[in-house]
Amino acid sequence: DEPDGVPTRQKQ
């Protein structure tokens, strides 16, 4: 899980 702030993948 990527930390909120680094939009590497669109979280839906």
Curated annotation (Swiss-Prot):
Tissues where this protein is expressed: Hemolymph.
Domain of life: Eukaryota
GO CC annotation: extracellular space
Subunit-level organization: Hexamer.
Biological role stated in the UniProt entry: Does not function as a hemocyanin.
Family assignment from sequence similarity: Belongs to the tyrosinase family. Hemocyanin subfamily.
Name assigned to this protein: Pseudohemocyanin
Organism: Liocarcinus marmoreus (Marbled swimming crab)
